[in-house]
């Protein structure tokens, strides 16, 4: 089954007769009776620049339920984002409550790398493909591995045994206007380049 999906928000604004309708995202979703098999990867050792959650969330604006990074490590080739334990329960708790947070873990880890490498803040714009695989074990030691690619990122979330839980390919962002405060960028290891 292939479904065309849209996330649409409607809000009434003061002084306007008609509600404002915004399409936030569109996607084609392929549903299958057979879940994809979880891949397995070797876990690389990350020895780059470490960034603590308190420094990340001085820049990021997420509330407690989506402060998914416990810490991150960045180097020129990519980033690792370590999933935070003990997040508040989601309002729609159930079997699938972990997947949005794991996708967000990829987004935020890519953002940390972008702050480190380019000193810029960006929001999600487009993802070419997302694959989620069935969880066969409890969520422990989950890590997002983010690899910069031409014009974007590829990412995956793996557990401590190397099992792949989520894969994103072709993730691209759009830069937010304005500059990040230089004193906040210092924690990310950003070093401005001389023109």
PLM features per residue range, with description:
Residues 1-195:
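Acyl-thioester-processing domains in fatty-acid/polyketide/NRPS systems
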């Amino acid at each position: 089954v292939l479904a065309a999906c849209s996330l649409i928000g409607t809000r009434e604004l003061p002084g306007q007769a008609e509600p404002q309708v915004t399409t936030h995202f569109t996607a084609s979703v392929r549903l299958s009776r057979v879940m994809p098999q979880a891949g397995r990867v070797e876990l690389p050792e990350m020895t780059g620049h470490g960034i603590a959650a308190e420094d990340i969330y001085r820049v990021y604006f997420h509330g407690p339920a989506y402060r998914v990074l416990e810490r991150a490590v960045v180097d020129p080739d990519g980033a690792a984002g370590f999933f935070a334990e003990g997040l508040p329960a989601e309002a729609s708790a159930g079997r699938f409550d972990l997947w949005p947070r794991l996708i967000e873990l990829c987004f935020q880890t890519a953002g940390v790398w972008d702050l480190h490498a380019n000193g810029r803040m960006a929001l999600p714009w487009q993802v070419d493909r997302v694959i989620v695989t069935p969880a066969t074990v409890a969520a422990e030691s989950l890590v997002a591995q983010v690899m910069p690619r031409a014009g974007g990122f590829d990412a995956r979330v793996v557990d401590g045994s190397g099992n792949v839980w989520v894969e994103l390919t072709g993730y691209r962002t759009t830069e937010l206007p304005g500059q990040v405060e230089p004193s906040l960028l210092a924690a990310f290891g950003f070093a401005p380049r001389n023109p």
